[in-house]
């Protein structure tokens, strides 16, 4: 039987370095036709995929496209975290062509400037470098968002996380959402005692999906929920965000400094 995907991480006094061991994993060997997607998606409301799946093998990319097309035919909301991972794209392929086709079916896109550039060649345009850092960041992301929505007309929202690294254990964390008309920005959280930042992006996306389902008419609330949920994840060891809805909402309603209360 095939092994599960494995990544390894060591705690030392330097930046995190992830080592992937996904070759010959079960996911890398999945092929179109192996799963009954119509039955799997029965009563489903949402399907999410990440850029890691098509990166690990051609067959997993083909299976991902199969799932996405069936989900689309069934009227299911589709989201992606573009997740560019250079170490994973090892097989001979046209990465931009693969990711463009997969992303064309998406309603919600999560990614940063690097994801957009590496996957689609999209870069910020006409940015005034004389503006202060925060304004340049927001302006550059707006430029990327507008290009992404032009390239992928089905998409309704483009989202990114903003991480400022003060040190290995102290980060500033926030998020931005653009819906084609308005840009929403969350408050910033000062995370001063990071336990584990691995899984921060996944917990953000999980929180965003929850927020968009439960607050469908309130982009700001959905974004704030996602950022608060992922902020709490930084205080938990491992991938899983072991927090409750009540804990996330409590942090959302906390003081303006956004400091995590332990």
Q: Could you say what each language-model-derived stretch is?
A:
Residues 23, 52, 83-87, 114, ...:
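Active-site beta-loop-alpha junctions enriched in small/polar residues
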Residues 75-82:
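Short beta-strand/loop segments at the ligand-binding rim of alpha/beta enzyme cores
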Residues 19-21, 46-48, 79, 110, ...:
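Structural motif
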Residues 65-72, 149:
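Surface-exposed amphipathic alpha-helices with a cationic face
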Residues 74, 88-182:
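Conserved phosphate/ATP/ADP-binding segment of small-molecule kinases
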Residues 168, 184-255:
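Conserved post-catalytic alpha-helical subdomain immediately downstream of the catalytic base
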Residues 8-58:
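Conserved phosphate-binding/catalytic loop of the ribokinase/pfkB sugar-kinase fold
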Residues 2-7:
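Short, small-residue-biased leader/transition segments that mark boundaries at the very start
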């Amino acid at each position: 039987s095939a092994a599960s995907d494995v990544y390894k991480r060591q705690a030392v006094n330097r930046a995190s370095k992830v080592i992937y061991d996904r070759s010959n994993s079960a996911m890398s060997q999945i092929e179109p036709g192996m799963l009954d997607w119509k039955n799997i998606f029965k009563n489903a409301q949402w399907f999410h995929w990440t850029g890691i799946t098509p990166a690990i093998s051609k067959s997993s990319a083909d299976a991902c496209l199969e799932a996405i097309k069936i989900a689309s035919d069934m009227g299911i909301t589709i989201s992606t975290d573009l997740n560019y991972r250079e170490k994973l794209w090892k097989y001979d392929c046209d990465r931009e062509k693969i990711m463009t086709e997969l992303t064309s079916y998406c309603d919600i896109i999560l990614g940063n400037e690097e994801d957009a550039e590496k996957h689609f060649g999209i870069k910020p345009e006409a940015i005034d470098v004389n503006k202060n850092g925060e304004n340049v960041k927001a302006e550059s992301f707006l430029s990327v968002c507008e290009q992404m929505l032009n390239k992928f007309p089905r998409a309704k929202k483009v989202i990114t996380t903003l991480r400022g690294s003060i040190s290995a254990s102290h980060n500033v964390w926030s998020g931005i959402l653009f819906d084609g008309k308005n840009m929403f920005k969350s408050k910033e959280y000062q995370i001063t005692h990071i336990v584990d930042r691995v899984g921060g992006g996944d917990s953000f996306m999980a929180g965003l999906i929850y927020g968009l389902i439960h607050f469908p008419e309130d982009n700001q609330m959905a974004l704030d929920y996602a950022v608060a949920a992922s902020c709490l994840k930084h205080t938990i060891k491992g991938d899983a965000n072991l927090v409750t809805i009540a804990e996330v909402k409590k942090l959302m309603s906390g003081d303006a400094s956004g400091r995590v209360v332990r």
